[in-house]
Amino acid sequence: MDFVKKILHQISRKSEAVSQITFDEDYNVPDARPDVGRMIQKKGEVTIGDVQISEGKARVFGGLTFHLLYVSDGERRRICQLSGELPIDETIHLDGLTGGDKVCITWEVEDLNLHLINSRKLGVRAIVTLHAWIEELCDLAVPMEIRGESDVAVKRQEYRVVELAVQKKDVLRVKKELTIPSGKPELHEILWQDLEVRGLDLRSEEGRVSAQGELFVFCLYSDGEELSLIHISEPTRPISIS
């Protein structure tokens, strides 16, 4: 009795691990920034700079960047912003990791707390979780039919599978100029911003993958007037890559 098999290529995780980083640091307000009176909004994100791979472990370098929107202290209260970065140097142990393996890393800021020590110093507390895993390409032999036996009952079931055509990483850098709508004041200083890709559509074409979507831009800015008026601009622009 012989099995007729078909080889399927698949990506599997050889090993994975989770590492949690705790931050509890003091941060001095830069000299160019006004004194902090009252905090309005905060956010943070992680930047992965470099990953050094050795036997059984990966050393991750990067930083936790935090942003703060606040009201300045003093007689003339203004809406201001500041940004800071705390370094990341974390070693993650991964069983079976070798020099030629590909390590994938995702991050999550589980908690970010900024508290006011005084008008020129902030306390920064945060918890960052790093998820790391090793991907490898392996072959799976799937039996398709049996030959050589006539008295063997066979039950068949159809499954839809996808084939890995190519695996690569590419970085899309979008650089566009957005015009402030008429009726809005001129921009003097950007205080807060958010970017979000919406309605992303990926399509396979001859020799390439096409992506289309919308880039949502939120911008909170000051016009530089003495009253420090705040205005919001929310244009949406289409993007297309291949």
Residue ranges of model-derived segments:
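Short, solvent-exposed beta-strand/turn "edge" segments of beta-rich domains on protein surfaces
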Residues: 14-17, 33-40, 50-61, 115-122, ...
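Edge strands and adjacent loops of beta-rich recognition modules
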Residues: 160-196
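Single conserved hydrophobic/aromatic residue that forms the stacking wall/gate
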Residues: 230-242
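Intrinsic, low-complexity N-terminal interaction/targeting segments
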Residues: 23, 29-41, 99-105, 180-195
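Surface-exposed beta-loop interaction hotspot
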Residues: 137-170
